[in-house]
Amino acid sequence: MLQRVRKLSLLRELLESGAAGGLLLMACAVLALFVANSPLAEGYFHALHVPFAGLDLLHWINDGLMAIFFLFVGLEIKREFLDGQLSTWANRALPCIAAAGGVVVPGLIYASLNAGSPETLRGWAIPTATDIAFALGVLSLLGSRVPTSLKIFLATLAIVDDLVAVLIIAVFYTAELNTAALMGAALVTLVLLGFNRLKVKRLAPYLVMGVALWWLVLLSGVHATIAGVVLAMTIPLHASKAAPDDATSPLHRLEHALSPWVAFLVVPIFGFANAGLSFAGMTPSVLAEPVTLGVALGLFFGKQIGVFGAAWLAIRLGVARLPVAASWAQLYGVSLLCGIGFTMSLFIGLLAFRDAALQNEVKVGVLVGSLSSALIGATLLSLTKRRLPAVDPSRDHQADATALDDLGREDAR
């Protein structure tokens, strides 16, 4: 019983931490827009391009700080698949299928609007991402109107989404390769895997080799953030009956240590550095540009159609089940929130395009699509509870008891 309460408390802490980080990210994005369109704009854009150790500040943020973000994402992915909500097919079916729909449909919408231009078609993956921090931040504003099972569904779907985004970045957004650096990175990876096989539990050796891996990957032409994911995959989970306490696990220790830094420093800094969009000289015609339309419509329409459509089909076919204590309307509302692409969408946009004008179109599309998804999704979810039918004790008592018991079991995992 005590262990169950502890696990529920940890889950609640995780959700609350993600929500708080999402709210801070929103604030930083708004602040960046304000600064970029104020008398401070010149200093803001100049500071981002101040050179330091061979790279400007913006590159250090996008290639360096974001490697820490991807390390954290990789740790989450590994933990969830080995020892979390995604460790069994029964739990992973719905978020995995929904995530697949949420990648395919937005990508197709973007591609259909940019099919005539090979240059802009490179951005097809921009609307395929979901920002877990931003989405959980919006959910936190709704309080108890959204059942815990749907919050878990959104969090696990976003983790699968991140895994797909990592694969997309590695496969489709890799520059010309430096073979020597790539071989060096492979050698360092083998050393890290050796640490894992030898059950090395101290984090220091992994982190030292991780820095070397990051530098070699940066030189190789593969985006440097991939080093964070590779490092995460080698950190041992070591969950065993002999050492069941999370404190004995290097993966849990590192994830717990990184969590506040990622939520309250890394992601907000990225948002502040990359969301700054100057509207000076911009006309309403930018909203009709294929890149802007592809990103905005992909996030807003593509995500909700893909996520909800795939989830509906999976549930109707009996492959998955509707989250406990959730209604179809609530599932649709959460599907809308999946259109909040922000962090990962902006990041992929920077990889897809070097042209400043195209990057600005990406930012406009991400802002329009993400804000529309957030506002309409939150509005729908705030109304759905009132629309639910009244409980009939003679009819629903047993079903409700079973649902609550199932929810407790899911939370305890």
Curated annotation (Swiss-Prot):
Pfam family, one: Na_H_antiport_1
Membrane topology field: Multi-pass membrane protein
Main subcellular localisation: membrane
TM regions (residue ranges): 15-35, 57-77, 93-113, 123-143, 152-172, 175-195, 211-231, 261-281, 295-315, 333-353, 364-384
Reactions the enzyme catalyzes: Na(+)(in) + 2 H(+)(out) = Na(+)(out) + 2 H(+)(in)
GO biological process: regulation of pH
Compartment(s) where it occurs, according to its Swiss-Prot or TrEMBL record: Cell inner membrane
Any one GO molecular function term: sodium:proton antiporter activity
One CC-aspect GO term: plasma membrane
Ion transport recorded as keyword: yes
Keyword field contains Lipoprotein: no
InterPro entries with a match to the protein in the record: Na/H_antiporter_dom_sf, NhaA
Gene3D superfamilies: Na+/H+ antiporter like domain (1.20.1530.10)
Domain of life: Bacteria
Keywords annotated in UniProt: Antiport, Cell inner membrane, Cell membrane, Ion transport, Membrane, Sodium, Sodium transport, Transmembrane, Transmembrane helix, Transport
Family: Belongs to the NhaA Na(+)/H(+) (TC 2.A.33) antiporter family.
NCBIfam families referenced in this protein's UniProt entry, alphabetically: NhaA, PRK09560.1, PRK09561.1
Protein role: Na(+)/H(+) antiporter that extrudes sodium in exchange for external protons.
Name of the protein: Na(+)/H(+) antiporter NhaA
Protein's organism: Caulobacter vibrioides (strain ATCC 19089 / CIP 103742 / CB 15) (Caulobacter crescentus)
Lineage: Bacteria, Pseudomonadati, Pseudomonadota, Alphaproteobacteria, Caulobacterales
Gene: nhaA
